[in-house]
């Protein structure tokens, strides 16, 4: 955490194809000028609640080719965020094993007991 905090003017962050398995809470909080965030082709199963809430300038985000865990209720933040910001998603984040779009996941199909 804090690794990007001093980069407050950063507009483009490419973290694709880095075998990331998790994002630290608050890792993007200071990146208010970020317009492009690339997270595709990693090993992300969910993102922390509020992970993208401070990215007020974001216009494009890439989340495809990650094994999103749509059985665990932790996915609901990302699902809701993507539904609210549909025009920003480049490609499509889909659930591991089902190819359901992450933005289409509902609370009824998830459970806290299914989280790792």
Where do the model's predicted regions map?
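Short, amphipathic alpha-helical segments
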Residues: 38-43, 48
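Intrinsic disorder
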Residues: 14, 38, 52, 68-72
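Short amphipathic alpha-helices and their capping/turn residues within compact interaction modules
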Residues: 4, 28, 36, 52, ...
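Conserved hydrophobic beta-strand positions in leucine-rich repeat
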Residues: 10-15, 34-39, 61-63
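Membrane-proximal C-terminal cap and juxtamembrane stalk of leucine-rich repeat ectodomains
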Residues: 60-116
């Amino acid at each position: 955490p804090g690794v990007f905090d001093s980069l407050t003017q950063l507009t483009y962050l490419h973290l694709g194809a880095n075998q990331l398995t998790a994002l630290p809470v608050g890792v993007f909080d200071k990146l208010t000028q970020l317009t492009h965030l690339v997270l595709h082709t990693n090993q992300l199963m969910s993102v922390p609640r509020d992970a993208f809430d401070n990215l007020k300038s974001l216009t494009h985000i890439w989340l495809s080719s990650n094994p999103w865990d749509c059985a665990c209720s932790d996915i609901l933040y990302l699902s809701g965020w993507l539904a609210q910001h549909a025009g920003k998603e480049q490609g499509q984040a889909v659930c591991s094993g089902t190819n359901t779009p992450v933005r289409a996941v509902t609370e009824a199909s998830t459970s806290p007991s299914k989280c790792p």
